[in-house]
Amino acid sequence: YVISAIPPTLTSKIHFRPELPSERNQLIQRLPMGAIIKCMMYYKEA
């Protein structure tokens, strides 16, 4: 598991294995910086 604390637009600089869905990458490319709402999520189990 990974917790990423970088702006979503910078995830295009990271090589993921397995690759992220193309729909997600397209959405991230279209979002301007600062248009994201931050939230915190807690899980009892991973």
UniProtKB/Swiss-Prot annotation:
Compartment(s) where it occurs, according to its Swiss-Prot or TrEMBL record: Mitochondrion outer membrane
Listed EC numbers: 1.4.3.21, 1.4.3.4
Cofactor(s) this protein requires: FAD
Keywords for this protein: Catecholamine metabolism, FAD, Flavoprotein, Membrane, Mitochondrion, Mitochondrion outer membrane, Neurotransmitter degradation, Oxidoreductase, Transmembrane
One of the GO BP terms on file: catecholamine metabolic process
An annotated Gene Ontology molecular function: primary methylamine oxidase activity
Catalytic activity: a secondary aliphatic amine + O2 + H2O = a primary amine + an aldehyde + H2O2; a primary methyl amine + O2 + H2O = an aldehyde + H2O2 + NH4(+); (R)-adrenaline + O2 + H2O = (R)-3,4-dihydroxymandelaldehyde + methylamine + H2O2; dopamine + O2 + H2O = 3,4-dihydroxyphenylacetaldehyde + H2O2 + NH4(+)
Topology within the bilayer: Single-pass type IV membrane protein
GO cellular component assignments: mitochondrial outer membrane
InterPro entries assigned: Amino_oxidase (IPR002937), FAD/NAD-bd_sf (IPR036188), Flavin_MAO (IPR050703)
Protein origin, superkingdom: Eukaryota
SUBUNIT field: Monomer, homo- or heterodimer (containing two subunits of similar size). Each subunit contains a covalently bound flavin. Enzymatically active as monomer.
Recorded family membership: Belongs to the flavin monoamine oxidase family.
Role of this protein: Catalyzes the oxidative deamination of primary and some secondary amine such as neurotransmitters, with concomitant reduction of oxygen to hydrogen peroxide and has important functions in the metabolism of neuroactive and vasoactive amines in the central nervous system and peripheral tissues. Preferentially oxidizes serotonin. Also catalyzes the oxidative deamination of kynuramine to 3-(2-aminophenyl)-3-oxopropanal that can spontaneously condense to 4-hydroxyquinoline.
Protein name, as recorded: Amine oxidase [flavin-containing] A
Organism for this UniProt entry: Ovis aries
Gene coding for it: MAOA
